[in-house]
Amino acid sequence: MRRVLLSVASIVFVSAVGSAQQFTYYFPQIAVGGGWTTTIFVSNATAGATGTATIIFTKSDGTPFKSNWLDEKGNDLTKGGNAIAVQLASGESRKFTSVGDASLTTGFATVFANSSAVLSNAMFTQFDGNGNVIAEAGVPMAIPLLKQALFVDTTNGIRTGVAIANPNVVSLPVQFQLLNDTGQVIASTTVQFGASQQMAFFLDQLFPNVPAMVGRLQFSATNPMTSVALRFNPPGIPFTTLSPLALAN
């Protein structure tokens, strides 16, 4: 089940961070192989101006995520590397799909764009042994947050999964607090999060002795992170994504 969580990605909150020349977005979860593919759509909503985007893929352990990605015409854009660079005319949209012909590998993606109007979404697809689609989830790109929360629901056998990416070049101590439906903190812990790395877990792995509940998991660090929650119905398929909430520091 943990491999399923590691295979689906990322945040459901859209925004941008950048200077006058560059805007940076993230997909905090990317899955390639083992019955999974990731598709990234990019569009230039700028009126009358060319948009550019560079997508850098990083593995969960912080090393370059080298894989093959095909465009909508079947051209291999990465050729075993870990970057896609694209120019888009005004109104143009592109599609990039990972080639899932190896064992499962996961990580996250960083998108550098020349405009806040160059926007993107990701779609994560799971296949059975015969190549049939059995589940999909789509999420938009996101910016990191210093303090955030994810809704939790573990009633009726449902499992809540969490995936977090640390896009910073420094290791972070992350403080987790689990709040019940009345807002009371019922469990807490601190986890060290490596630089440029990613972690994924089910709530019952982080807090194994907590009974079935509805509430929220909130967490914070000294540098911002990106996250997504995944709600898995028994026996783990189908699933859906849950958006993070930005909290006041």
Residue ranges, per PLM feature:
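Positively charged n-region of N-terminal signal peptides that target proteins for export
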Residues: 1-4
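Bacterial N-terminal signal peptides
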Residues: 7-15
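Gly/Pro-rich, tryptophan- and cysteine-flecked surface segments typical
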Residues: 18-249
